[in-house]
């Protein structure tokens, strides 16, 4: 198959974003994905999740306005990484950020709380590479952690009264 050439301005823009590191952190479950016929730990069913178009539209607006990169930071077990990547691609293909993102997930069989796993990934991988200008998440414990880290523009897109 022939590779398509990317227009020069698009190529430069993409390179600039990655070097510049301006980004937003986006959670998956409960934020951009709504569980559809599965429990929170049924990783083999993540491909059936429904997208939350309203939230994706908000993310699209932030990406366009700030010319930033999307960092998906998920508490999902890495056992479903391939399905998660495919789900992201399939459900964001209509958005400008569909090919301009990175995914970080918890290690396989890591059962620690989301806030602990995400904070660890943040300090080890995200903070050294990216200038985070906002966060989209749904879990109260994780939202609190982002606030404690003093990240700007922490946006709750779920029901803050539901915990598991």
Predicted regions and their residues:
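Substrate-recognition "cap/lid" segment bordering the active-site pocket of phosphatases
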Residues: 78-132
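Acidic, Mg2+-coordinating phosphoryl-transfer loop and its flanking beta/alpha structural elements
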Residues: 1, 122, 130-164
């Amino acid at each position: 198959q022939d590779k398509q050439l990317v227009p020069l301005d698009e190529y430069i823009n993409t390179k600039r974003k990655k070097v510049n590191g301006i980004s937003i952190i986006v959670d998956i479950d409960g934020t951009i994905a709504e569980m559809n016929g599965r429990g929170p730990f049924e990783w083999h069913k993540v491909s059936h999740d429904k997208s939350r178009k309203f939230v994706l539209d908000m993310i699209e607006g932030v990406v366009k306005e700030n010319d930033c990169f999307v960092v998906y930071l998920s508490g999902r077990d890495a056992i479903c990484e391939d399905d998660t990547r495919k789900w992201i691609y399939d459900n964001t293909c209509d958005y400008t950020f569909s090919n301009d993102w990175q995914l970080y997930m918890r290690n396989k069989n890591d059962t620690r709380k989301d806030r602990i796993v995400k904070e660890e990934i943040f300090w080890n991988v995200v903070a050294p590479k990216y200038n985070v200008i906002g966060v989209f998440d749904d879990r109260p414990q994780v939202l609190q952690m982002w606030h404690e880290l003093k990240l700007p523009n922490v946006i709750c897109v779920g029901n803050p009264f539901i915990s598991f």
